[in-house]
Amino acid sequence: MARTTPIERYRNIGISAHIDAGKTTTSERILFYTGVSHKLGEVHDGAATMDWMEQEQERGITITSAATTAFWSGMSKQYPQHRINVIDTPGHVDFTIEVERSMRVLDGAVMVYCAVGGVQPQSETVWRQANKYQVPRVAFVNKMDRTGANFLRVVEQIKTRLGGNSVPLQLPIGSEDNFKGVVDLVKMKAINWNEADQGMTFTYEEIPADMVDACEEWRQNLVESAAEASEELMEKYLGGEELTEEEIKAGLRQRVLAGEIIPVCCGSAFKNKGVQAMLDAVIDYLPAPTDIPAIKGINPDETEGERHASDDEPFSALAFKIATDPFVGNLTFFRVYSGVINSGDTVLNSVKDKRERFGRIVQMHANKREEIKEVRAGDIAAAIGLKDVGTGDTLCAQDAPIILERMEFPEPVISVAVEPKTKADQEKMGLALGRLAQEDPSFRVHTDEESGETIISGMGELHLDIIVDRMRREFKVEANIGKPQVSYRETIRTRVNDVEGKHAKQSGGRGQYGHVVIDLYPLDPEGPGYEFVNEIKGGVIPGEYIPAVDKGVQEQLKSGPLAGYPVVDLGVRLHFGSYHDVDSSELAFKLAASLAFKAAFNKANPVLLEPIMKVEVETPPDYVGDVIGDLSRRRAMVNGQEANEFVVKINAEVPLSEMFGYATDLRSQTQGRASYSMEPLKYAEAPKNVADAIIEARKK
């Protein structure tokens, strides 16, 4: 089979935004205008095509990033047909892992902002992730029809809050109820959409007289941005010559791909205005797979390798999402970076060093699927029934193994105990949790050794609620959940030297003997978390026992002496000890090390660390006093507030343990008008009274 769409005409894009900026509605409109779905799905009535898990439709938020393929030839059919793979990413902070993971496999992103709310807390998180993976982006200011909409304010916020060099491609004609259309600053024409056919058709018209001056001024800004792309464009521009439409677009494209500017469009997805022009911007300015640098990887001999976006290179792909589908079982979404895969081929999972046979391959359109025979470089598809592929694994040709970059996943901050309501469900619950953990690396399951309880951990209350909910719906397991547990940590504040640990049992027969002397010292919280320094001189402890000392200490780190929480940010220096020719063993040195560590830890001014969350509350001005008062009762440190006439943003740092049930309390204080987001910020020392209470409770 030959390629149906040349790789230059592919666009792999993510659509990401803050909750409620209207991202799913925007994705829906893309599917509608590109001719894939014939009925518009509205999030309000729970029928949006992209939000396909039942809970997403109930809660009206997007949880799983569905990948969908759509085709586009431009508003005026001005391009050959392009193929756009759209990845819809969640905007809720508990699902940041999904966003991070999809950023890995995207080439470009559309950032959706609300014309009223502007750049909101989650927008900043998503922006940082896009920077981390150097993803070129365009912005779409949505909800221009809402009261309080202000396009230029959002353009300004992209500069001041995110540090993005925003360049408007359009200006809105009217706003709020009078929002009629947009002026295209490249063509210098007004675009009006036809409301009778849901905006499928539109007309180019003259710019309204009262907008001509503003449009001239902003066009100047646009042309200048384009001219900065190259010396020849700059010379032409400074020489007073007009740049052609092609030159302006080429200049802007070059600068977007270099990450220097963010073109901004506007519209109202709900009112069917502006989405097609935004799709044109995706084709004009966002990269094809061939425009981005080759993906780097690691060859089997640990040297660096790379794969270019070409069908002729060996096959390589990254599995970026595992989803459980009620009809076909496991769906593994993957992005092909190089080469071609056909159904029936066997490939290597180079991370686990196992072979996998590709059976059926499907291309997803939200939750409908079309079976295909092959997938080529630059494309995204899903495979059915792969046996042992996890998120972030590399799939590659058996004769050309490579491991593409590994993804890094955050540590969970909150845990709850779960137990099935009936004994019969015990095994089913284990299976269900295992399957869900395979799909979502930011979710962990383990059994508490002391209590025997099953503990699930994740990125926030909502994250765990949804896991329990999915167990009920998809696996028919009813479970009771305990009170949330916070992941505390233990560390030390002062250095202690020359603490010894001795394990000796020498009463006839083969004895046990190990003896170590260590120093214990604090490490910087930004550092490695733990280090072990061996400074044994003259063989007072033989080399083969040194790893046992390290191991003995590390086993103690899992459950600290204060309250049984993990120990972090300390170093151990082993500098003296003794051994016995016959009685010494690895086990004896391991035990000696653990005794020395416990003794040293208790002398080194041990403290309990608690997770601190970065919390941002947005509230109408009337409730600011109540909200701040309540935050102070939760031991918050309020760092400041920003206000406009509609909303006040309060930034605070709050211990996670004080944030349980906050959503409900905030709703009742503000009659449901405030919202908040939180993300893990750091660990900090817990005040003595708090620490004492926690340690006391753990002893019971």
Curated annotation (Swiss-Prot):
One GO molecular function term?
guanosine tetraphosphate binding
- Binding residue positions for GTP: 17-24, 88-92, 142-145
Q: Name one GO cellular component term.
A: cytoplasm
| The keyword GTP-binding appears for this protein | yes
Mainly resides where?
cytoplasm
**Gene Ontology biological-process entries:** ribosome disassembly
* Matches recorded under PROSITE patterns: G_TR_1, G_TR_2
Residue stretches making up the tr-type G domain: 8-290
Q: Where in the cell is it found?
A: Cytoplasm
Q: Where are the transmembrane segments?
A: none
Query: Which SUPFAM superfamilies has this protein been placed in?
Result: EF-G C-terminal domain-like, P-loop containing nucleoside triphosphate hydrolases, Ribosomal protein S5 domain 2-like, Translation proteins
Pfam families in the cross-refs: EFG_C (PF00679), EFG_III (PF14492), EFG_IV (PF03764), GTP_EFTU (PF00009), GTP_EFTU_D2 (PF03144)
Q: Span of the secretion signal?
A: none
Its keywords, alphabetically, are:
Cytoplasm, Elongation factor, GTP-binding, Nucleotide-binding, Protein biosynthesis
Q: Which NCBIfam families match?
A: EF-G (TIGR00484), PRK12740.1-5 (NF009381), small_GTP (TIGR00231)
Alphabetical list of PANTHER family matching this protein: RIBOSOME-RELEASING FACTOR 2, MITOCHONDRIAL, TRANSLATION ELONGATION FACTOR G-RELATED
The UniProt family comment states:
Belongs to the TRAFAC class translation factor GTPase superfamily. Classic translation factor GTPase family. EF-G/EF-2 subfamily.
HAMAP family, alphabetized? EF_G_EF_2_B (MF_00054_B)
Q: What does this protein do?
A: Catalyzes the GTP-dependent ribosomal translocation step during translation elongation. During this step, the ribosome changes from the pre-translocational (PRE) to the post-translocational (POST) state as the newly formed A-site-bound peptidyl-tRNA and P-site-bound deacylated tRNA move to the P and E sites, respectively. Catalyzes the coordinated movement of the two tRNA molecules, the mRNA and conformational changes in the ribosome.
Name of the protein: Elongation factor G
Q: What is the lineage of its organism?
A: Bacteria, Pseudomonadati, Pseudomonadota, Gammaproteobacteria, Pasteurellales
List the gene name. fusA
